[in-house]
Amino acid sequence: MGDRPEHIAGVEHVDLAGKHALVTGSTSGIGRETALALGRLGADVMVHGRDAAAGAAVVDELTAMGREATFQQADYASVDDVRGLAAAVQEWTDDLDVLCNNAGGLFRDGRLTDLGVEYTFHVNHLAPYLLTAELLETLADDARIVTTSSGAHRGVELDFEAIESVDSYSGFRAYQRSKLANVLFSTALAHRLDRTDRSISSNAFHPGAIPGSGFSRFLPGPLPRLFATLDRLPMTTTVAEGAATAVSLAASPRVDDVSGRYFADCEPKEPSAAARDRATQRRLWEQSADLLEIDEPLADGRQ
């Protein structure tokens, strides 16, 4: 049992009974491991993904633990589907305690979504931005928002023109930009939440390069070793180890008062200089709302 995420994170004795958690992208990989770990700690869990059969299998595992579990199918490239996911959460609970923004992917072919946004950026950043905005009033006052980023956010700056273009498309470069956006978003969200009277935290993390995952298969040449070195991590990570940081951020009392940070291997790390740039955080926050044609979330908490 020591290789389970909650044991690796040192939170196996934390009691989440009565808590409600949404883990997006939880039909496989680290999302699935995170959902099951939170269930073992006592939380009721909403599972999300595109594969209904895989979602039902995770729900079955959770209900076998005695947890309340449900599955919601949603395509993250569809604004309507993301709004439908938020509506399903609001029907499920009035107080969402944990929001794990985990769903995402790495895509070889360049294409635009119906919004005219590059597909990787839309799925990996705009969708969780919209979901979080839709759920702000549903989150418990001490909720934890955990966003899956990547060490791949290093070595790139956010090219705002590339957000709406697939000219000279590189799947890995698009992935890097989206993972940088995850850290920028998570940090900007933390700053805005800090200006409210609620105690909601927002943190991002790097799960590691997991052998066999889409990320590790796509990494060119020496990059897995480079990212591991920068975050002082092993070059490869098991799925359970990758999920451990998410579980720690969702459950550990050690991070009760921690927000706006980037983590790897359950420890805070310094993200790239581009990820720490406050002007870029502000611009991304505002432009994301414009692209989605929604009011700027938490506008009263501008940096």
Where in the sequence are the language-model features?
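A glycine/serine/threonine-rich, flexible loop-to-helix segment
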Residues: 211-229
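Rossmann-fold NAD(P)H-dependent dehydrogenase/reductase core
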Residues: 2-214, 294, 298-303
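C-terminal helical subdomain
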Residues: 178, 204, 228-269, 278, ...
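C-terminal helix-and-tail extensions that cap enzymatic domains
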Residues: 259-262, 269-303
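Alpha-helical packing segments of well-folded alpha/beta enzyme cores
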Residues: 37, 85, 185, 242-245, ...
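A short, mixed-charge helix-start or loop-turn motif at secondary-structure junctions
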Residues: 24, 167, 171, 228-232, ...
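A generic structural signal for secondary-structure junctions
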Residues: 165, 220-221, 254
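A generic "alpha-helical surface" signal
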Residues: 53, 80, 240, 279-282
